[in-house]
């Protein structure tokens, strides 16, 4: 497995799950602007981004925003992510909770404006989840580069390989193949299949009753190997166990639920199946045609206009100084 010390930094691409990084700071970072407005999402996002760029010196850097969800997934399963609720700031209580939806969206607008003044490329594809965009960029557009995906979302574990590594802002560490195997008993190459079987409460995807990652890994040890296991192979193995007289309920539950697992696999897999041709073209065009630029003075002015006086702009721009501008 390639180690970080072996990286050719000129070939290291940083892919940032923008809303994932932003929301963890929006709900927890207490920073306020000079007029008392909450700006924690902005400051936390920029601070984490600066630290990651300083540590890994990636070039280029892409910040990928959510595009309003996936109509294709909702067509497959109408209840997909239907339980999601607006984020709430964790330091307000009862009736004192402000309009967090408005506050969240306003800070995102400010962040988008600020990032335009840096040599960072922002990617937004309508009717598309950031997961799919990052999946495409990682698997295809930057196939031969080393990718670092900045996200705490386990959905991206299926992308981990010798050429793709995840940096978790929650754990403050790199997540590589062995970490996934050690924690889940499943290799990243089989992570999407395992998730299709076990389900995902965070996305409102029901799994097979009585089957979690621990049970699945125990009953199907081949999932821990660096070899892709197909759904049909999994079903065949489960059916064989049942026919051989196994009393383990997990085998029967899996063997009897091919349709559910196949549907879930369509929902959780990050590949081109959930992207339209025009969306793929948009991703390619953005990546190929972006011309980095920087405007530090305007960046400072924009921060001051929002009452943000505590962020160290010099450090951010120094961290990004290795990215050549047009």
Residue map of PLM features:
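Short, motif-level signal for alpha-helix interfacial/capping segments enriched in acidic residues
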Residues: 1, 128-139, 185-195
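Noncatalytic, basic helical substrate-engagement surface that gates or grips nucleic-acid strands
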Residues: 5-150, 156-174, 269, 274-289
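Non-catalytic nucleic-acid-binding/docking modules located in mid-to-C-terminal regions
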Residues: 5-10, 55-65, 82-86, 118-121, ...
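Intrinsically disordered, low-complexity segments enriched in polar/charged residues with Gly/Pro
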Residues: 108-109, 152, 192-197
């Amino acid at each position: 497995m390639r180690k970080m010390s072996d990286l050719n930094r000129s070939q290291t691409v940083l892919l940032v799950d923008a809303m994932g990084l932003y929301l963890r700071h929006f709900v927890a970072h207490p920073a306020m602007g000079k007029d008392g407005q909450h700006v924690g999402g902005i400051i936390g996002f920029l601070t984490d981004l600066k630290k990651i760029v300083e540590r890994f010196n990636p070039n280029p850097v892409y910040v990928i925003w959510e595009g309003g969800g996936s109509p294709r997934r909702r067509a497959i399963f109408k209840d997909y992510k239907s339980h999601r609720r607006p984020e709430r700031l964790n330091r307000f209580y009862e009736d004192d909770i402000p309009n967090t939806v408005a506050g969240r969206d306003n800070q995102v607008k400010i962040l988008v404006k600020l990032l335009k003044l840096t040599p960072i490329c922002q990617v937004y594809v309508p009717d598309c989840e950031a997961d799919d965009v990052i999946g495409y960029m990682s698997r295809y557009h930057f196939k031969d580069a080393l990718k670092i995906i900045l996200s705490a979302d386990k959905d991206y574990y299926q992308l981990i390989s010798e050429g793709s590594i995840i940096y978790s802002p929650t754990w403050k560490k790199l997540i590589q193949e062995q970490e996934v195997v050690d924690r889940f008993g499943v290799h990243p190459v089989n992570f999407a299949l395992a998730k299709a079987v076990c389900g995902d409460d965070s996305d409102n995807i029901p799994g097979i009753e009585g089957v979690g990652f621990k049970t699945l890994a125990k009953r199907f040890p081949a999932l821990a190997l660096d070899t892709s296991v197909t759904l049909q192979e999994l079903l065949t193995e489960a059916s064989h166990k049942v026919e051989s007289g196994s009393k383990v309920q997990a085998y029967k539950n899996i063997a009897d639920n091919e349709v559910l697992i196949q549907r879930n696999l369509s929902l959780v897999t990050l590949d081109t199946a959930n992207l339209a041709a025009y969306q793929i073209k948009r991703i390619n065009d953005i990546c190929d045609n972006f011309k980095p630029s920087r405007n530090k003075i305007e960046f400072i002015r924009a921060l001051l206009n929002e009452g943000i006086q505590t962020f160290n702009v010099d450090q951010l721009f120094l961290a990004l100084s290795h990215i050549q501008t047009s």
